[in-house]
Design a protein with these regions (language model features):
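Active-site anion/phosphate-binding pocket segments in diverse small-molecule metabolic enzymes
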Residues: 1-137
């Protein structure tokens, strides 16, 4: 549908890496050790989980790392944190984008809704008050 105006995304969800550790091919992580690393890489942890409103079934979603890497959430989304598998090392403190744009890559609320078989409205309503809101003009 054509609009008489441009729509600009008005929301992003970002977190800083709090832990980063190397993984070897076949290493298992997550609830029930259900995820096995497909190759050598790194497991980074961010402090956003389903108690923040990020969907419990968000495992497999892309995550955009500030250094240009694209990772995937693995091992299930925990209550207060999520783990992301990446190929190259990532420093603690690096920004990870779960919703938003980094360079020419983006993850939208629609992407998350489709992946989790939910709706944008339901996802928005689930975001917890403890998530910091920054209003920009």
């Amino acid at each position: 549908m054509s609009m008489p105006f441009e729509l600009i995304p008005a929301l992003s969800l970002k977190a800083k890496v709090v832990n980063s550790k190397p993984l070897k091919k076949g290493d298992a992580v997550g609830y029930g050790a259900e995820y096995h690393a497909p190759n050598d890489g790194y497991l980074i942890t961010i402090p956003i989980g389903h108690s923040d409103g990020y969907p419990f079934n968000g495992s497999g979603m892309r995550a955009l790392v500030a250094d240009g890497q694209i990772g995937h959430i693995v091992g299930g989304v925990a209550m207060d944190q999520s783990m992301i598998f990446v190929t190259n090392p990532v420093a603690v403190g690096t920004t990870v984008t779960l919703i938003g744009r980094v360079g020419d890559q983006s993850i939208t609320m629609q992407d998350l809704a489709e992946h989790t078989q939910s709706s944008i409205v339901a996802l928005m309503n689930d975001f917890a008050p403890r998530l910091q809101r920054i209003i920009v003009s």
